[in-house]
From Swiss-Prot:
Na(+)/Mg(2+) ion exchanger that acts as a predominant Mg(2+) efflux system at the plasma membrane. Transporter activity is driven by the inwardly directed electrochemical gradient for Na(+) ions, thus directly depends on the extracellular Na(+) ion concentration set by Na(+)/K(+) pump. Residues 28-55, 92-121 are annotated as: Disordered. Disruption phenotype: Morpholino knockdown of the protein results in ventral body curvature, hydrocephalus, and cystic kidneys. It is a multi-pass membrane protein. InterPro entries: SLC41_membr_dom, SLC41_membr_dom_sf, SLC41A1-3. This is Solute carrier family 41 member 1. It catalyses: Mg(2+)(in) + 2 Na(+)(out) = Mg(2+)(out) + 2 Na(+)(in). It comes from Danio rerio (Zebrafish). The chain crosses the membrane at residues 133-153, 156-176, 216-236, 253-273, 284-304, 317-337, 347-367, 377-397, 441-461, 471-491, 515-535.
Amino acid sequence: MVLWLKDQDKLSDMSTGTERIEMKKEGVPPAYHHSNGSVHPVILPDSPEEVPQTPGEYELTEVTSLPDCGDQENERPDMVVLDCRANAKGQREEDALLENASQSNESDDTSTDQSPVPPAPLKETSFSIGLQVLIPFLLAGFGTVAAGMVLDIVQHWTVFTEVTEVFILVPALLGLKGNLEMTLASRLSTAANIGQMDTAKDMWKMIMGNLALIQVQATVVGFLASIAAVIFGWIPEGNFRMGHAILLCASSVATAFIASLALGLIMIGVIIASRKVGINPDNVATPIAASLGDLITLSLLAGISTGLYKELEFNNYANPMVCAFFVALTPIWVLIARRIPSTREVLYSGWEPVIIAMAISSVGGLILDKTVSNPNFAGMAVFTPVINGVGGNLVAVQASRISTYLHMNALPIVEPNPAPRKCPTPWGTFFGSGVNSRSAKVLFLLVAPGHLVFLYTINSMRGGHTTLTYIFIAFYLAAALLQVIILLYLADWMVNWMWRRGMDPDNFSIPYLTALGDLLGTGFLALCFHILWLIGDRDTDVGD
């Protein structure tokens, strides 16, 4: 906190601190108090009656010039509280706005204070949140429907029937939109909202650093996902074929690399356009990331794996060369990502959530492999991307919004003496008075109508092998609602828990949440199909 006194000799009459400023003189109440370190210049009034007595936000006038000192001995010194706010790392920075518009900045070398002052948080109602989320949500949903139609078709292709481990790759690679693209969208949305992309130079630095970062992550995650698929495919029966293992590796790495590059470019365009038209990027970026993410990734996986499978008969070197080519590009992306401070930290510390999320999604892939491989449950393929995608999209929006809320309100990342905090209750998550509770209710209310629209679309396009009976729709909606309730509650707890421990939720929370969405969605859907089979709700066209 920076103080300026007209009479510096009277500084002993003042008591200063990081949390409050008050006069020691008797009868003068605190002039201004802000617990988050984000305050604006204010002159303490001469009369105590002019001081606001109730907490809240007040309209304050910035001081750009100061009056000359008088010769009167009894004149009370005027005190100017100069601008003090938290930077992107939660550390405080001080700006002294003096006469002639001179400015002095004190911050660490990671400060982003050179950009214009970030805009104030948007005041959002439930209606405005729903209006902004609805269209991207529907676009994302239709994208997952298209992905489901593709999976329903390609499940009968030779590569999927001969190398069934490819099914294990499906949730892991589709989950890349949560591990990488949605994390990228959340990270850039937060940066845009807090003013870190207001200048062209800062914007290009963020773009280049983040694109290089996701290419590194995509290559590594794609490689690890193929290893997980080989292990999960080998454990049940003990069969291992080197040719199939290299095929899985080449297909996974190539798909992850190309899909991440294409989706990353789309995300950057969406976020920049959202800011220009005055839309909160948190509401539109993550759903649009998923609207094309599943379709592009699944189409690439099917096409690349089919082409490489055909090469096994004629060329034993094609698959290893493809895998080696994309892996060899990794050092280049590492060098680019290291040059940008905002991505350097993620490059070193952001691997844990990505790798763990990939492992969680691979477990969901194992469930999908064992279920779809059974002809009695082949109808599950078309619905898996839909239920997983919708749940992941909604929880990614909520996590991104909570993270932006914490950043924009300058809440301390690490409290010096954190008080024990109980886990949030489901009632508080959905029926609290804050904007995050309102958004949770809006997102939950979109689940049932959205899934009904998507189910009708699949049925109209004659997709899948399952007749939409009333009992099937009831079980399907129950699974979808339960999945989203769990995910939204976990988002409320996880984002705040990570924030209090100094972890940036933009980088850590969304991979876990979308991976859990894949696991819960696939598990609940498989359970529904098994229950329906047991109670006799079976189709004569299953597997046709």
